[in-house]
């Protein structure tokens, strides 16, 4: 499968001109053996450094891309953060002109960030269908404990070898399925924000993301049977998600309330115990179930007007008490110009019928749960290290990790505990 990314660039009916940094993506068995052909075809020249984790280095042993320098990172406790990026930047030879990421999500975020810091080119070789960030223009980092996106470089070319991807640990593709499942609530949140505040909504990008999500959900039985074509479908959807984000210029089409749930768990607030880590996509998959359940509950209300309250900012004291001093200052700054302040009582009341229709179009929690169950994937809070008793705390505080309008954030303007 060859994706010509240039066709997604240019003027659009939404009024914007979309730009694309990624030129092409190849999703084929054995395509890493043809690495040199694609580098020549797209004119990617200069000294290379290939960045691996120990696991991806072993998995691709018979097809390592040619590179003058190789950096292999210890996967123990490896995260895309200030520590790993400092290590790579210190090791990266000064005359390297191209970074080649050979690995899954963490390796890619480290590589794309370092490419941006050095002002050099970036090529992506995913070894697991685990996250939708392969084509991203930003790096998803945990920076001094705070989950944030930092400027980075999108890959010029993506070479996804499905022979490698299919033989990767099952938890990687389960994470990828969870990350794509998350697009349903992310898209609903985007559309609801458009209704409430006239936030820009591009129908072309929306359609790309919707199709990607539907493709993966239909491929779940094939994944369960170990079919390589199903793994290719997941990889395709993850890459298209990244292309959609490039077109938009941010992660809005791919990230909503379910991602904020995942991010809050990853940040480990002081007053929120997390027993053990889980992969990003595993958390967004569970986050999707939680968000769909809550949104469907709210949609049962025919008239929200009696439950609407005035907007009120979150007191600084709450950030310090719940998130702790390690995270408080960053989150206070993140929420300074609260997007929820743009939503009036009148607009929320008048738009409620339209919001209910958007929620009605979401897949049911039962349908999404059955798909995760078919793969024996994680599908409740306990499986991702969080007590079920913490659910209400999670729903209340997770929107605060990102200043982005979602229905979950809008709950602050509802007398939520009076709604049965």
Describe every region a protein language model picked out.
Residues 94-114, 118-128:
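A short, small-residue-rich loop immediately preceding and capping a beta-strand
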């Amino acid at each position: 499968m060859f994706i010509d990314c240039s066709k997604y660039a240019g003027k659009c009916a939404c009024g914007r001109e979309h730009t694309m940094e990624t030129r092409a993506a190849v999703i084929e068995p054995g395509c890493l053996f043809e690495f040199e052909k694609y580098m020549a075809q797209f004119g990617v020249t200069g000294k290379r450094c290939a960045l691996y984790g120990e696991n991806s280095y072993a998995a691709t042993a018979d097809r390592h891309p040619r590179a003058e320098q190789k950096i292999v990172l210890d996967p123990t406790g490896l995260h895309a953060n200030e520590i790993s990026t400092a290590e790579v930047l210190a090791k990266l030879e000064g005359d390297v002109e191209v970074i080649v990421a050979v690995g899954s999500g963490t390796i890619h975020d480290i590589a794309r960030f370092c490419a941006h810091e050095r002002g050099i080119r970036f090529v992506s070789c995913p070894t697991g269908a685990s996250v939708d960030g392969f084509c991203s223009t930003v790096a998803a980092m945990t920076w001094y404990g705070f989950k944030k996106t930092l400027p980075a470089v999108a890959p010029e070319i993506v070479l996804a070898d499905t022979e490698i991807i299919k033989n990767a640990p099952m938890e990687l593709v389960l994470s990828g399925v969870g990350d794509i499942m998350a697009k349903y609530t992310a898209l609903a949140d985007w559309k609801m924000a458009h209704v409430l505040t006239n936030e820009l909504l591009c129908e072309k990008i929306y359609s790309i993301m919707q199709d990607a999500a539907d493709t993966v959900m239909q491929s779940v039985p094939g994944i369960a049977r170990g079919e390589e074509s199903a793994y290719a479908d997941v990889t395709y959807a993850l890459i298209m998600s990244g292309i959609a984000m490039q077109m938009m210029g941010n992660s809005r089409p791919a990230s909503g309330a379910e991602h904020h749930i995942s991010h809050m768990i990853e940040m480990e607030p002081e007053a929120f115990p997390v027993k053990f880590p889980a992969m990003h996509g595993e958390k967004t998959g569970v986050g999707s179930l939680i968000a769909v359940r809550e949104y469907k509950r709210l949609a049962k209300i025919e008239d929200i007007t009696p439950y609407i309250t005035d907007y009120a900012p979150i007191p600084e004291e709450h950030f310090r008490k719940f998130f702790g001093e390690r995270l408080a200052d960053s989150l206070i700054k993140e929420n300074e110009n609260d997007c929820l302040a743009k939503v009036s009582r009148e607009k929320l009341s008048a738009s409620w019928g339209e919001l209910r229709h958007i929620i009605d179009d979401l897949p049911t929690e039962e349908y999404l749960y059955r798909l995760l169950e078919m793969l024996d994937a994680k599908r409740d809070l306990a499986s991702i290290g969080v007590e079920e008793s913490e659910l209400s705390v999670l729903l209340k505080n997770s929107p605060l990790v990102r200043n982005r309008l979602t229905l979950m954030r809008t709950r602050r303007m509802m007398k939520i505990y009076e709604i049965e």
